[in-house]
A protein has these predicted regions:
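Conserved glycine-rich cofactor-binding loop
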Residues: 21-22
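Conserved glycine-rich Rossmann-like NAD(P)H-binding loop of the short-chain dehydrogenase/reductase
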Residues: 35-52
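The beta1-alpha1 cofactor-binding region of Rossmann-like NAD(H)/NADP(H)-dependent oxidoreductases
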Residues: 66-77, 109
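Substrate-binding pocket helix/loop in short-chain dehydrogenase/reductase
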Residues: 103-116
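Active-site helix of classical SDR
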Residues: 127, 163
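Residue(s) in the substrate-gating loop at a strand-loop-helix junction
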Residues: 147
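C-terminal helical subdomain
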Residues: 187, 203-229
Length: 229
């Protein structure tokens, strides 16, 4: 894709990116910082967000808003700060989440609760907090991170895959529901990406790509307004 098209898409936009302290989120922050947008980064770990900002091309355009995104009020507070500082929000990229694997010999409902909270509900809260601002934007996009695991019943991924399937379903529905509000909705469904999370895996991961390459594909998908990236 021509660099001018990428540039024109993000220039003068206000972007909120969650889960920006590591992995795909960090790579996305670095990729987006090349453009003249105001970039707000969120995650639970302030120090790691500072590291992400230090790696960005235009750190003066990168703002840190740390907090626990599994709490609704945290999301609302961050969006209020974005509105107060920048007056608008054009693109919300809700990427925060984690991964744990199920042991069927020690089936633990608490693990499911954790992943539902951190993967699914954190996105629901981010949507609730950001929608009022996105509805005011003339060119809004809502983007959520899922996974190919959301399409497949992978052993040990019963909890993780379920949350990702829920995200796919929700964003497919919102694509239709938010059309009258002129909000484009995309869902990101990567395969294996080399990150701190996948470094912990103890099984083969075919066709793995780097976080940087994943971020490149995601940015292009956002510009094309592709629903499933």
């Amino acid at each position: 894709m021509h660099s001018d098209k990428l540039k024109s898409h993000f220039d003068n936009k206000v972007v909120w990116l969650t889960g920006a302290s590591s992995g795909i989120g960090r790579a996305l922050a670095i990729a987006l910082s090349k453009y003249d947008c105001q970039l707000y980064l969120s995650s639970r770990t302030h120090d790691q967000l500072v590291k992400t900002r230090d790696m960005c091309d235009q750190p003066e355009n990168v703002h840190i808003e740390a907090g626990d995104l599994s709490v609704l009020e945290t999301n609302k507070t961050i969006c209020k700060k974005i509105e107060a500082q920048s007056g608008q929000l054009d693109i919300a990229i809700l990427n925060a989440g984690t991964c744990e694997y199920v042991d069927v010999n020690n089936f633990d409902s608490a693990l499911f609760e954790r992943l539902i909270t951190h993967n699914y509900l954190s996105m629901v809260y981010g949507i609730e907090a950001s929608l009022p601002l996105l509805k005011e934007s003339a060119d809004a996009q809502l983007v959520g991170m899922s996974s190919t695991a959301g399409y497949l019943g992978i052993p040990r991924s019963e909890a993780y895959g379920s949350t990702k399937a829920a995200i796919i379903n929700m964003l497919r529905a919102l694509k239709v529901s938010l059309k009258p509000n002129n909000i484009d909705v995309s869902v990101i469904c990567p395969g294996f990406v080399k990150t701190e999370l996948t470094d912990r895996n103890d099984f083969p991961m075919p066709a793995m790509i780097s976080a940087e390459l994943a971020a490149e594909h995601i940015v292009k998908g956002i510009v094309k307004r592709t629903h499933e990236i």
